[in-house]
Regions:
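Alpha-carbonic anhydrase
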Residues: 1-290
Length: 290
């Protein structure tokens, strides 16, 4: 592992990891508190009964969120105005997972831009100095912040602890206005955080879509569109039993009932026609039932 800070760039990629860097998430809303640590903004995130993240078959919960300025990574050898670092703790032991998204100065806006801007402004108003804390009084979800786009992956240290890193590239940076970036730089100071890492890999597919985490199903597979992947499904042992009452609401069940009724009607009609035909061909005598 190199002692130099890793540079997030396509020119540094050793290979693709579409098959071995599977990232799935379904983050819930949180009413967070923020603390100004002088060199970063630290945010709490509400815990949930179901881990919101699965990375390479391991389940993770959100530990905390940090906002720094400038970015702790370089992107094509250039620092970005800021970066959000989402720290995850493994549920069953293992190394932590960090998900990082850089900020860029832009007049464009997104839902992530609005959330980050609101957080920065609230901290600037209510916790502008080192050591200050504030309740944000806003609900937000990382679901609206983490892009469903390709990302880079490496394994490296953070504060002396080995971790898996997912880092979104410059193209996926969260746009913030120059005013918001200036506000951020006024309430926290730049601090060089070392991010040495090993080989850099690239997941061109992005996070897995369509998972229903929390319904007792966890899927460790590759992103949608990967034709060479096998999908393994692990069912929660505590999932509820099948509800037979749902059968009667099923469109398939209703279609089957309609077909059966239609067949019975056709049988009755043909039987009636047969009796009427025999009546006409036997001089008006109806056949006798024995």
């Amino acid at each position: 592992m190199s002692s130099e800070n890793i540079n997030i760039s396509s020119t540094n990629v050793k290979g693709k990891c579409d098959n071995k860097c599977s990232y799935a998430f379904k983050y819930s809303e949180s009413s967070s508190t923020a603390k100004n640590n002088g060199v970063l903004i630290n945010l709490t995130y509400d815990s949930t009964s179901v881990p919101p993240v699965v990375y390479n078959s391991e389940k993770y919960i959100v530990e905390n969120i940090n906002i720094v300025s400038p970015s702790i990574h370089t992107f094509n050898n250039v620092s970005m105005p800021g970066e959000i670092i989402i720290s995850h703790t493994p549920q069953s032991g293992g190394i932590p997972l960090k998900v990082c998204i850089p900020f860029t100065s832009s007049s464009e806006s997104s839902s992530a831009s609005q959330i980050i801007t609101d957080i920065i402004n609230k901290v600037a108003s209510n916790a502008p100095s080192e050591g200050d804390s504030t309740n944000l009084n806003m609900n937000f979800s990382l679901q609206q912040i983490v892009p469903r786009k390709p990302f880079f992956v490496y394994t490296g240290e953070y504060s002396g602890v080995n971790a898996n890193w997912i880092v979104y590239g410059e193209l996926e940076a969260i746009p913030l206005s120059s005013t918001t970036i200036t506000t951020l730089q006024q309430i926290i100071q730049a601090f060089p955080i070392a991010t040495p890492g090993g080989d850099l890999f690239y997941n061109s597919k992005g996070p897995i879509s369509g998972l229903q985490l929390g319904d007792g199903i966890y899927i460790s597979c590759q992103p949608t569109g990967s034709s060479e992947e096998e999908t393994s499904v692990e069912y929660d042992k505590n999932s509820t039993s099948f509800d037979f009452s749902n059968i009667f609401e099923s469109p398939i069940f209703k279609s089957i009932i309609i077909i059966i009724i239609g067949c019975l009607l056709l049988i009755i009609i043909f039987y009636g026609i047969s009796i009427f035909y025999k009546y006409l061909t036997t001089d008006g005598e109806l056949p006798k039932l024995t």
